């Protein structure tokens, strides 16, 4: 069990893509679901499914996306804001990942969104992770 749910999500996806797994699974939370929805929208993963488990808990199964048999759609997935050091940014100082080739995942007052969308809506927030 992880103390940081975002670290669990990133670690499971990174380990799954490096091992060329078709899917990975982990415990469900609202924040993880919002991040996965953004990753599907941006085209980094195929899909995700939430399955009930015992004890009224649920498990999320993520289907990873590959360009061909060996190359993952995600080249890198890095956590930025951590429980011991939160990183916040205004809409004017939102980071660009690889000059716009990747995305920064931002939690704002309007929900979880990419850095591009946050710039359009003029909102800042906590910079959770970079994906490229």
From Swiss-Prot:
Family annotation (InterPro entries): Ribosomal_uS8 (IPR000630), Ribosomal_uS8_CS (IPR047863), Ribosomal_uS8_sf (IPR035987)
Keyword tRNA-binding found: no
GO biological processes: translation
Pfam families attached to this UniProt entry: Ribosomal_S8 (PF00410)
Disulphide-bridged cysteine pairs: none
Cellular component annotations (GO), alphabetically ordered: ribonucleoprotein complex; ribosome
Single GO MF descriptor: structural constituent of ribosome
Keywords: Ribonucleoprotein, Ribosomal protein, RNA-binding, rRNA-binding
Manganese is among the record's keywords: no
Coiled-coil residue windows: none
Subunit relationships: Part of the 30S ribosomal subunit. Contacts proteins S5 and S12.
Annotated HAMAP family: Ribosomal_uS8_B
Job of this protein: One of the primary rRNA binding proteins, it binds directly to 16S rRNA central domain where it helps coordinate assembly of the platform of the 30S subunit.
Family to which this protein belongs: Belongs to the universal ribosomal protein uS8 family.
Protein name: Small ribosomal subunit protein uS8
Organism whose genome encodes this protein: Ureaplasma parvum serovar 3 (strain ATCC 700970)
